[in-house]
A protein has these predicted regions:
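Short, glycine/acidic-enriched loop or turn micro-motifs at the edges of active sites
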Residues: 54, 121, 153
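Helix C-cap/helix->beta junction micro-motif
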Residues: 84-86, 142, 199
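Substrate-binding cleft of secreted/luminal carbohydrate-active enzymes
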Residues: 145-158, 167-204
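Aromatic-lined glycan-binding groove of carbohydrate-active enzymes
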Residues: 110-114, 127-164
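Structural preference for beta-strand elements that scaffold enzyme active sites
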Residues: 44-47, 87-91, 112-116, 145-148, ...
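Active-site cleft segment of glycoside hydrolase catalytic domains centered on the general acid/base Glu
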Residues: 6-110, 124-133
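Short, flexible, mixed-charge acidic loops at enzyme active sites
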Residues: 2, 6-14, 157-169
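A cross-domain feature marking catalytic cores of carbohydrate-active enzymes
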Residues: 1, 48-50, 92-96, 117-119, ...
Length: 204
């Protein structure tokens, strides 16, 4: 996430230990951090940031105000991965598919392997058919592998603890196909998997 809290399109907050760094120092710290992860975990896949629609490590990597610095940070992270592994696949992760074509055009010259998409019906549309078309377009236009990096679907709308349900209403669901039941949850995941793996570049 490159943050002390959740990173998503609405917030990409610098880790507190990096707040005093200038841009060049931040790049080096990012490189060192990713290198440490690569050495300790040896991952098969790695994301450079989480849901980076609007950038990373604000304000330095804000796409709107600092697009060139955003690309520098991403490329620096990619270099750290490539320096330690020729097999680890690099994911660039976008939330939803609205504006995804624009984003992946922006990063077209970045050396990455996989387009990662978040898909939550509540926020990103309630049609698996539309999702299928969007994933196909991304695959064809950019020639990258495709995966669903984040998703979730409830098996109940019941309030069974003291934590608020993010998805808690019928209007958040894909009905009548996928009710909030164990079977509805299972069928949603099954059909989503079918959509992704139905693409020649779909990996999961």
């Amino acid at each position: 996430h490159f943050s002390d809290t959740w990173a998503h399109p609405g917030q990409q907050i610098l880790p507190s230990e990096w707040e005093s760094l200038n841009f060049d120092e931040l790049k080096e710290e990012l490189y060192s951090h990713i290198s440490q992860i690569m050495t300790e975990i040896e991952p098969e896949y790695i994301q450079i940031g989480n849901e980076i629609n609007t950038g990373i490590l604000f304000p330095h990597g804000d796409i709107v105000n600092n697009p060139n610095q955003f690309l520098e940070l991403i490329n620096h992270g990619v270099s750290a991965v490539r320096s330690l592994s020729s097999t680890t696949k690099i994911i660039l992760h976008f939330a939803g598919y609205e504006a995804s074509q624009w984003f992946y055009n922006l990063v077209d010259e970045v050396d990455y392997d996989v387009i990662g998409i978040s898909y939550y019906p509540k926020w990103h549309g309630k049609s698996l058919e539309e999702l299928e078309g969007q994933l196909s377009n991304l695959s064809e236009n950019f020639g990258k592998e495709i995966l669903i990096a984040e998703t979730a679907y409830p098996f109940t709308l019941g309030w069974n603890d003291w934590t608020n349900n993010i998805v808690g209403l019928d209007e958040h669901l894909i009905l009548p196909d996928y009710p909030a039941t164990p079977e509805g949850q299972r069928n949603f995941i099954r059909d989503l998997k079918t959509v992704v793996l139905g693409d020649s570049r779909g990996v999961g």
